């Protein structure tokens, strides 16, 4: 559910990087996601991610009078902190310009819901403060549920033990989870099978 463009609004994607010993993938809409996924399935080394830095966020904010940024959960990435630092710097260097940064406390699909709601508010011509207030209200009513087919990537980046990932693969176990109110990705249950 990556979001690279959003019709009807001036939109900028500030991407994460996916890093292996052999390659660096920039999740910006031009990346060959299927090719990367195939490579990672057979890759034996560690993988990691890198969040956008303050300069990346400042480049995205450049020239705008009002900026609304929605980040991946701050519990998984430093994106929110970098976006906040960039917001402070941008507003200091550009008096009168305003930046609102929202930690989605989530990933993917919920971020899309937030971005689409933001677009709709802007299309209605709402004022900056009203948009910020409504986004905080709306955010309380969105949630993320997810299903993981494989734990391989979590094992490669040290979040689960490789033996656990291998056992889950052999037994056909899928993890069903949700994003908590604090932005943690929590396991709800484990199930077996394809669907």
State what each model feature region is.
Residues 2-12, 16-18, 22-23, 75-79, ...:
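Mixed-charge interfacial surface used for oligomerization/domain docking
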Residues 42-43, 63-64, 70, 138-141:
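Structured helix-beta-strand junction loops
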Residues 48, 69, 101:
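Short catalytic-loop micro-motif centered on adjacent basic/acidic residues
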């Amino acid at each position: 559910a990556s979001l690279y463009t959003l019709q009807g609004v001036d939109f900028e994607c500030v991407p994460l990087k996916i890093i292996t010993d052999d390659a660096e993938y920039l999740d910006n809409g031009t990346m060959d996601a299927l090719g990367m996924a195939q490579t990672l399935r057979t890759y034996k080394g560690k993988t990691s991610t890198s969040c956008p830095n303050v300069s990346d966020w400042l480049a995205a904010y450049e020239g705008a009078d009002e900026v609304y940024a929605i980040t991946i959960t701050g519990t998984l990435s430093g994106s929110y902190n970098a976006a906040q630092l960039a917001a402070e710097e941008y507003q200091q260097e550009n008096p009168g310009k305003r930046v609102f940064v929202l930690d989605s406390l989530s990933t993917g699909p919920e971020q899309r819901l937030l971005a689409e709601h933001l677009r709709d508010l802007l299309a209605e011509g709402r004022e900056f403060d009203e948009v910020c207030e409504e986004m905080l209200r709306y955010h309380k009513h969105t949630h993320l549920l997810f299903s993981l087919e494989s734990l391989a990537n979590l094992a490669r980046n040290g979040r689960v033990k490789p033996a656990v990932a291998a056992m889950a693969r052999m037994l056909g176990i899928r993890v069903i989870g949700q994003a908590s109110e604090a932005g943690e990705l929590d396991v709800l249950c484990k199930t077996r099978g394809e669907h």
